[in-house]
């Protein structure tokens, strides 16, 4: 139904994201596929779930695939479309063009850094991003042993010091971290929201069962107030931008210095040349 990034390998060689669901698996929320981009209400189409009637993101091409000593880069172009068989009232069946630029940095083994620069461009008809908690511009589903609900030591932490779902769900924060054990090693993954992203600092749809997603749309749910509206309408040619960093680290967020790693992302050193 949509592209995803899997596996997300941590510092000890194991994936920090859950295995991909197969039809015969009894996994909850099988549409939570490692690291992905989607939203639950796009012109009435559900491009978050899977199944009959769901919207889709169709991969079109890789405009760039690069590798080098400092970083590798992939620029993937996709199209957000309606459910299978849907016919648009305009020329194309595309609601949005997705440009997902992924940069994979060559970093020390105790920490891995991946940047996502996401641009969604409205095509030939107005597009409504609905106010729903089911979705987000960048989502992560962690390995099962890392889940808070597993009782094995998993924990959620946000930039404001909130802990676990009760203190982080629906809250705004510049970053959110999910840490816990994988094959005997304490590891974590932090998702960071850049100041240039839409509605920074983002709201978080983060759950004790392993989901962590940056969702800037679901305001009525997060505030529990139907007068707070988070929907957005794009007209043809308008764009929505999200910039995120995924920091996969050893140990917990304090030991990995996630707060300062966020500052490196949001406020990098500036270089100027004197004449």
Outline where the language-model segments fall.
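Beta-strand-rich recognition/accessory modules
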Residues: 192-275
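Short, well-ordered beta-strand segments enriched in hydrophobic/aromatic residues
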Residues: 114-122
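A short, structured loop/turn motif at beta-sheet edges
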Residues: 62-72, 106-110, 181-186, 197-198, ...
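Short coil/turn motifs at secondary-structure junctions
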Residues: 83, 123, 249-251
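Active-site/ligand-binding surface loops and adjacent short beta/alpha elements
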Residues: 126-128, 132-203
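Beta-strand-rich N-terminal accessory domains
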Residues: 1-29, 117, 126-128, 195, ...
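Extended, loop-rich substrate-binding clefts of extracytoplasmic carbohydrate-active enzymes
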Residues: 28-110
């Amino acid at each position: 139904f949509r592209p995803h990034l899997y596996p997300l390998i941590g510092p000890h060689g194991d994936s920090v994201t859950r295995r991909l669901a197969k039809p015969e698996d009894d996994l909850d929320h099988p549409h939570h596929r490692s690291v992905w981009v989607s939203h639950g209400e796009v012109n009435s189409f559900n491009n978050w779930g899977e199944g009959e009637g769901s919207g889709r993101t169709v991969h079109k091409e890789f405009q760039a695939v690069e590798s080098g000593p400092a970083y590798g880069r992939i620029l993937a172009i996709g199209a957000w479309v309606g459910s299978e068989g849907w016919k648009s009232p305009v020329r194309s069946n595309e609601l949005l063009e997705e440009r997902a630029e992924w940069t994979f940095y060559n970093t020390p083994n105790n920490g891995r850094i991946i940047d996502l620069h996401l641009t969604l461009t409205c095509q030939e008809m107005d597009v409504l991003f609905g106010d729903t908690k089911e979705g987000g511009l960048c989502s992560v589903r962690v390995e099962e042993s890392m889940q808070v609900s597993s009782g094995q030591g998993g924990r959620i932490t946000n930039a404001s010091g909130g802990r676990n779902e009760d203190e982080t769900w629906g809250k705004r924060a510049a970053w959110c971290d999910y840490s816990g054990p994988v094959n005997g090693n304490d590891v974590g993954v932090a998702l960071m929201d850049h100041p240039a992203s839409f509605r920074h600092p983002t709201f978080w749809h983060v759950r004790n069962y392993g989901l962590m997603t940056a969702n800037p749309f679901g305001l009525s749910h997060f505030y529990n107030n139907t007068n707070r509206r988070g929907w957005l309408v794009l007209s043809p040619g308008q764009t929505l931008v999200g910039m995120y960093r995924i920091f996969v680290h050893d140990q917990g967020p304090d030991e990995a210095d996630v707060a300062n790693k966020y500052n490196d992302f949001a406020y990098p050193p500036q270089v100027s040349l004197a004449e």
